[in-house]
Amino acid sequence: MKSYIAKAEQIERKWYVVDAAGKPLGRVASQVASVLRGKHKPIFTPHVDTGDFVIVINSEKVLLTGKKLDQKMLRHHSLYPGGLKETPYREALNKKPEFVFQEAVRRMLPKGVLGRKMLKKLKVYRGTEHNNEAQKPEVLELKY
């Protein structure tokens, strides 16, 4: 029996919408990353982008458990000596919740060209409104 390898022209992409309100950030992000990779499909192939598009709404209402809002830091570096910038997640979620969610998903995807291609299929919005109604997205039920 031969192993099945998905080809780019055989892949049918769907659009899903996920409501992140009141759900833990890591749990939602891990399931979104799985759908972006295509691991929910029987034709999943690790080196081919078989994933679907995902729209995340209410990104500002995502939960962080424990004391993570105050203790966990969002870090980036300017590449200059002493250029480490740290922002508590409470402040980052108030200013740019879309970025916080996108970074959580990005870190769960493969590093490299394929991961960047997968991340382009993620659309994150603040609030319940999004501009992808024309794609007729289905509601994605989260497992937990």
From Swiss-Prot:
What are the UniProt keywords, alphabetically?
A: Ribonucleoprotein, Ribosomal protein
Keyword Ribonucleoprotein in record: yes
Q: Which GO terms describe its cellular component?
A: cytosolic large ribosomal subunit
Please indicate which superkingdom the organism of origin belongs to. Answer: Bacteria
Task: Indicate the quaternary assembly.
Answer: Part of the 50S ribosomal subunit.
Spell out the NCBIfam families in the cross-references.
rplM_bact
| Protein name listed in UniProt | Large ribosomal subunit protein uL13
Q: Which organism is it from?
A: Clostridium kluyveri (strain ATCC 8527 / DSM 555 / NBRC 12016 / NCIMB 10680 / K1)
